[in-house]
């Protein structure tokens, strides 16, 4: 069981808002630092990713998973829950899980 978690969505939020990836390398450097520190400490964590990251930035999601960490689902597009009907929320979650599972090739549990 992981007791440490991170929300990883900066790549997607920037792309969604600006349609560019200007800060990609900066975000990647921060993620590399986090993953390296976790390795040094012998810790594993759950990284919650929006489903769209599995579609637009699969290399980021795969990197986290390949370093032995769990990928968790943090919705598909980070839409406010109070802006969705229950059916829309269910569909959003299903689509997000599908995107992430296709990306990493295994079940998303969180």
Question: Model-predicted segments: where are they?
Answer:
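Catalytic alpha-helical scaffold of carbohydrate-active enzymes acting on polysaccharides/glycoconjugates
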Residues: 1-110
